[in-house]
Design a protein with these regions (language model features):
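C-terminal engagement/docking regions of AAA+ P-loop ATPases
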Residues: 298-381
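Walker B catalytic acidic pair
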Residues: 165-166, 177
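AAA+/P-loop NTPase substrate/partner-engagement loops
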Residues: 118-144
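Pre-Walker A (pre-P-loop) alpha-helix and adjacent loop at the N terminus of AAA/AAA+ ATPase modules
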Residues: 65-97, 103
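Conserved alpha-helical scaffold flanking the Walker A/P-loop in AAA+ ATPase domains
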Residues: 144-162
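Canonical AAA+ ATPase core
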Residues: 145-147, 170, 174, 182-262, ...
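Conserved C-terminal "switch" segment of AAA+ ATPases
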Residues: 77, 231-304, 334, 339, ...
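Walker A/P-loop
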Residues: 93-128
Length: 381
């Protein structure tokens, strides 16, 4: 059922067309409750049927609920991997890239495909193999007889969402081509440079089980990723739900898939702006900096930390922690960033940026254990 109601902001009144699909927000006006669609600005009109800046701000105050609904929707199809789903949304909103490490069959591919079905954008999977060439990723120049000239044929990197499957199975040249595109947001071929879309997210995967014949990513390239997420097997209850979902999907295989309401790219960009403006107190900002400095000067926080940490976190890591903490807080529908939000994303942001010593490895100390010690020892300013 569609309802049109009047929303007030200051002395102005706006007519808002209701849509009871993804991204609904509850409003109570004159003791009556209505829903306003938040994911797609085209659903919001004023009396002249035009989208206005004022109504954008009105809707923007609660637009995080659209992404909360998106999180819930994805969790219904990606069962037992809530952490992965949440980190995927954080990477989307923080405008970064994700490195996911997990055994085969844990819904890594399914997660980003389901996300692509729910946002306005296109998706491409790149299977990394030892014989892959850089041009297979970025594209190549093709000679056309019609005009006797070379024309650039864009590769799969020119999509909004990219799955770089088993990135450590391709040679360093191919990895560098992808990581350069991730860092510079452009591809250079010959004398020409081609910009990538504003909405650009790469989710790269690694298989921790089979390491033979792989090309491990060096630390300098790992630093390009916003987060390094490790995922494990679902629990017994989730396994039951996965079986039920798989049977339901199999029985509906021949049926026409329901068209999902998509969140527009504009809504994503507006969400990013809100996240950048989220309030962060000087104490929380100092806490982020102290966490980074503790990885560079670990002796201040204990001789054992100094013995375990070889290289600390770069300034890019500090920036990444700030962006991820803001995005995490925003997804919780908070209007400020707390130390708990920083700690919630700390492992995924620092995991691939702290290099531990051989002595730590000999003692069986992992990077995650080092990060746990940082959380316990670094006080909030």
């Amino acid at each position: 059922m569609k309802v049109i109601f009047i929303a007030k902001k200051g002395a102005k009144r706006y007519s808002i067309k209701n849509s009871s699909l993804l991204g609904n927000c509850l409003f109570t006006i004159n003791r009556l409750t209505y829903f306003a669609h938040l994911g797609n600005p085209q659903k919001v009109l004023n009396r002249n049927n035009t989208f206005t800046k004022e109504i954008s701000e009105f809707i923007g105050m609660t637009s995080s609920s659209a992404f909360k609904e998106l999180n819930h929707s994805l969790s219904q199809t990606i069962i037992g991997q809530h952490h992965l789903v949440e980190r995927l949304l954080i990477a989307l909103l923080a405008d970064g890239h994700l490195l996911v490490e997990g055994a085969p069959g844990l819904a890594k591919t399914k997660a980003i495909k389901e996300l692509s079905d729910r946002i306005e954008g296109n998706f491409q999977r790149i299977q990394f193999t030892p014989d892959l060439l850089p041009s297979d990723v970025t594209g190549t120049e093709i000679y056309r007889v019609e005009d006797g000239a070379f024309h650039f044929q864009k590769g799969p990197i020119f999509h909004n969402l990219i799955l770089a499957d088993e990135i450590n199975r391709a040679p360093a040249k191919v990895q560098s081509a992808l990581l350069e595109a991730m860092g510079e947001r452009q591809v250079s071929v010959g004398k020409e440079t081609f910009p990538l879309d504003k909405l650009f997210l790469v989710m790269a995967t690694q298989n921790p089980i089979e390491q033979e014949g792989t090309y491990p990513l060096p630390e300098a390239q790992l630093d390009r990723f916003l987060m390094h997420v490790k995922i494990g097997y679902p629990n017994q209850e989730s396994e039951h739900s996965i079986l039920k979902l798989a049977r339901a999907e199999q029985s509906q295989n021949d049926k026409v898939k329901e068209t999902l309401e998509k969140i527009s790219q504009q809504a994503i960009f507006e969400g990013r702006e809100e996240i950048n403006k989220l309030h962060m107190s000087p104490a929380v900002e100092e806490y982020i900096i102290h966490l980074t400095m503790a990885t560079r000067q670990p002796a201040k926080y204990g001789d054992d930390l100094a013995r375990w940490i070889d290289f600390g976190v770069s300034p890019r890591g500090t920036i990444s922690l700030d962006r991820c903490a803001r995005a995490y807080a925003w997804l919780q529908q908070k209007d400020f960033v707390s130390p708990d939000d920083v700690r919630a994303v700390l492992h995924d942001v620092y995991r691939h940026r702290i290099l531990i010593t051989f002595e730590a490895e000999a003692e069986g100390i992992t990077t995650d254990q080092v990060i746990n010690e940082l959380i316990h020892r670094v006080p909030v300013a």
